Amino acid sequence: QVSIEKPTFEKYAAYVVELKERNGLKVKTAVRYKDMLKRINAEIGPIKLQDLRPDHLNRLYAKLAEPGQNKKTGGGLSAKTIVEHHRVISTILAQAVKEQLIPFNTAERATPPKLQKHEMDAFEVEEVQAILKALEMEPLKWQVCVQLLIATGARRGEIMGLRWENVDWTENKLYLCENRVYTPESGAISTTLKTGEN
């Protein structure tokens, strides 16, 4: 539980994530939130919610774009990833508004980077043929998995969540009913689908 007496962003963020987990936040989403909150809290964690201003957030977004922030590449975070951080902050502050701890959501007054619109990049026929050819030497389970991914356009976790009872042999249909995800903390677990059922 968080003290109602002027909590810091970090303390309140931990409370909100815990609250959302109790109310059905997906495991992978919770892990991602906590990962982003490490970077966010390093900059704005000690600031009291009431004292948080748009310029604090704008400085955070600029810092996230600096070299060294991306542990894999050594560069800055992409605009898309910075916007994801912005959305986490906005979610936390929206809860604070809802609980009447602050009068407005400061994130709505900040300026995250603009996202460039891009088209989805689909495989060409020749690329699919090359993938299927390369699969011929792989174990059957990987052949089936990749063929299902290509044929259905389903997410990896949705294919991993398939069971025999999800196959309608008469109608030649697959029913996607659960999502299989892995996190280091929980191992492999089944969750609900990202966008509804079947």
Where do the PLM segments sit?
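Short, intrinsically disordered, charge-balanced linker/junction segments flanking boundaries
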Residues: 1-4, 117-118, 193-198
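N-terminal DNA-binding module of tyrosine recombinases/phage integrases
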Residues: 1-59
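Charged catalytic carboxylate motif
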Residues: 12, 32, 36, 56, ...
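Short, surface-exposed helix/turn micro-motifs that flank interaction/cofactor sites
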Residues: 31, 90, 160-161
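N-terminal DNA-binding recognition helix of tyrosine site-specific recombinases/integrases
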Residues: 36-39, 47-55, 59, 66-109, ...
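Short regulatory "switch" loops immediately downstream of catalytic or recognition motifs
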Residues: 59-72, 133, 177-184
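Basic, Lys/Arg- and aromatic-enriched nucleic-acid-binding interface segment
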Residues: 75-79, 83-85, 98, 102-162, ...
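C-terminal catalytic core of Y-nucleophile DNA break-rejoin enzymes
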Residues: 175, 184-185, 191-198
